[in-house]
């Protein structure tokens, strides 16, 4: 089989189907791309964690229907280098050969097509459920909240993003760290993997989101290609799915009258200095607030940060891991933040960092 297709839509199609961040050795199928060619269509299938994707392109095929499985990232990278108006994909016993003008490039197959077939997303039967995708909201989650996602499997539910109505929570129970924003877009409360966030961020503006039972389908239609991707969230009713979202959301409402307004850039500078001069691998800093302002201190650094507002006069001291505290302040979209004490049973147990876009709760370390 030889299949000829326009290069520009092929580049767009591979960019949609193959998301670099979603290719991982931990999900072996993600390293594969399945190419199927008929006399009229080229179909590109990929899989990643809880995601099935498919793109169909029109073109001209010569020969019998052919299927092959090759390296996904290698295929995407090679296609991106092609500059001719058209490219021909020749299916061989060993994989494929891309022919561009007088040049050709051989890509070996990774598996025989009769050994494995990648899953395809379901077709859309109900157009009435279509909604626009606000990519900026998903981009906000990726850029400002995903940093807090747990990486340890000790509490696997916190490796996901919780979203319900407009609320979005991302956090790590082990580090007593949680973030909250109101950029959610899905109707049902559910848990999303970082792979799903990457998918939604990568979509073009014309993409639509469809509800398919407990799953969702993202679709894009153009004159040159049709794209669909189906993803399955995790739900709190499932095993390991309890995020304790109600409890966490309750923590996100501190007494803001007791907050101190400070320049986050000054906090980051002080933390960088503390990390630079740290004399121990197990390094903590003392975070002290009083009616004069904020002080960040350890055995070698003593940095004072003046407040941007009239301080409430409340005083408290907490210990933090400087790297985690730095990640919290860095994640805030705005440089000026309000920091409030987190009070539980009349005891200060952490801080709540607030700007106009999000709220972050970070628990202090035990002495």
Predicted regions and their residues:
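Structural preference for solvent-exposed beta-strand-turn elements
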Residues: 1-367
